[in-house]
Swiss-Prot record:
The lineage of its organism: Eukaryota, Metazoa, Chordata, Craniata, Vertebrata. This is Maximins 3/H9 type 1. GO terms for biological process: defense response to bacterium; defense response to fungus; killing of cells of another organism. It comes from Bombina maxima (Giant fire-bellied toad). The modification Isoleucine amide is found at residue 144. Expressed by the skin glands. Keywords: Amidation, Amphibian defense peptide, Antibiotic, Antimicrobial, Cleavage on pair of basic residues, Cytolysis, Fungicide, Hemolysis, Secreted, Signal. Its main location: secreted. One of its GO terms (cellular component) is extracellular region.
């Protein structure tokens, strides 16, 4: 009988020891996971701070550039280029969001002004395209003739 008790107690001690080792391994792995998550949070925090600093620097540089450009006198050529860029941006906006662009452009206009506005836009878009096509056809006709 004593032998059975010794074996049973030994078995209980061995299983308790195995469970404690298993629990230690789990707690170590959980601790490792928590440490990894914490280090990732720190890295993300640092990355976020760097990005916000870059955004602030870019905004400041853009504002400085804009204020420098706006406060100096522009030449007629620069003014014309800016007007063309603004027109191109409006045309691109109207292509992306035609309903909003037409609403924005037609606010406060009567029907005649609306018709004139759209014909001006068509001329502005079609004029350069037709000019290029006519130049290309003229060049082909000269080569053939």
């Amino acid at each position: 009988m004593n032998f059975k008790y010794i074996v049973a107690v030994s078995f209980l001690i061995a299983s308790a020891y195995a469970r404690s080792v298993q629990n230690d391994e789990q707690s170590l792995s959980q601790r490792d996971v928590l440490e990894e998550e914490e280090s990732l949070r720190e890295i993300r925090g640092i990355g976020g701070k760097i990005l916000s600093g870059l955004k602030t620097a870019l905004k400041g540089a853009a504002k400085e550039l804009a204020s420098t450009y706006l406060h100096r006198k522009r030449t007629a050529e620069e003014h014309e280029v800016m007007k063309r860029l603004e027109a191109v941006m409006r045309d691109l906006d109207s292509l992306d969001y035609p309903e909003e662009a037409s609403e924005r452009e037609t606010r406060g206009f009567n029907q005649d002004e609306i018709a004139n506005l759209f014909t001006k836009k068509e001329k502005r878009i079609l004029g350069p395209v037709l000019g290029l096509v006519s130049n290309a056809l003229g060049g082909l006709i000269k080569k053939i003739g």
